[in-house]
C-alpha cells in the first residue's frame, strides 16, 4: 500500500479510502490511485481484509437475461471496478423468472456476499425481501416500483424523448413505438419520454402505434407485423430494446420495405453490429460499462458506511446518446407501405 501511495502522490489513508470506499475521495486522486495500483499490479490481500473487517470481499450480480448483450457489458464494468479493489463477483441469471431470482438471492445471502447488484425481472419480489434483511443492494437498469434506497440507470425518459425528437425533426408524424413490457421501468420511462416529445410537437399518439409486450426477438416480429398490417402503417418506428429491434428488422426485410426510403427506424442499445446493418442503424446508446462501474462504487459506499450515514448520491441517472446513421431520413409523401407480406 505504501508503494501505491508513493507512486500516486497521496497518503496511505487515501489509498485505504479508495480501497474501502468508506471515505469520499476526489475523482482526480482516485484515478491516480487506481493508475498506480494497475502499474504496480497491486492486489489487495482479500483474506487479510476479510479477517480484519468480517466481510467476504465478494458481491453478487443478478441479471434477468444474460443472452441480452446489454447485461454482459454492464457486468464487465462491475468486474473491472471490483477487481481493482480486490472484490470477486458472483454472477446469476434469473432468466426473467421471479422464482429463480428469489432462489439466486437466497443463495447469495447464504454465501454471505457483502452486497448485491440487481437488475430485477418483471413482478420481482426481491426488494421487500432484501429490505427485511437490511441487506446492501443497488438496483441497476430495471428499478422496483417501490422507492429503493440506491439505484443506477440510464435516464430513460430523456432517452425516449431523444428518439422521438429526432424523428419529429425529420418531419415524421406517424411514429410508432415498440415498447416492451411496461412492468419494467426502462420501457415505462422510454414511453413517457416518447409521449413528452410528441406532446411538445402537438403530434397525437395513436393507440395502435404503441406496441407493448415482452422483450424477445419473437415479440419484435409480432409487433412489426402488426404495425405494417395497419390500414395506415407508420412512417417511422422506435424500438426500445436490441432484441426487439432484430425482430422488427427481420419483418422489414421479409416485406422488402426499403429503409429509410419507405420507413425510418431507431433502435436502442448501440452495439458494433449496428454499424454493419445495411443501412447502419440509428440508435440510442447507453453507457453500459459506466453503469456497471458506478453501480459497484455505489454498492461499496453502502457496504462500508457507518450507521446513520447518508449516501452522497443515492440515485444515479446516466445520460444516453443518439447516434445517427442511415436508417432514418426525412419523411416524404410516398405510396402507402404494403400492408401484406410478399407471397
What are the functions of these language-model segments?
Residues 27, 42-107, 111-115, 192-195, ...:
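Amphipathic helical "hinge" segments at domain boundaries
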Residues 117-127, 139-148:
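Acidic, Gly/Pro-rich loop/turn segments at junctions of secondary structure
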Residues 1-57, 342-343:
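N-terminal helix-turn-helix DNA-binding module of bacterial transcription factors
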Residues 7, 12-17, 52-67, 166, ...:
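Short beta-strand segments enriched in small/hydrophobic residues
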Residues 48, 102-105, 127, 164, ...:
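Short hydrophobic/charged patches on amphipathic alpha-helices used for structural packing
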Residues 95-98, 119-124, 243:
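Short beta->alpha connector loops
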Residues 39-45, 99, 118-121, 221, ...:
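Short gly/ser/thr-rich secondary-structure transition/capping motifs
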Residues 7, 39, 80-85, 109, ...:
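Bacterial carbohydrate/catabolite-sensing allosteric modules
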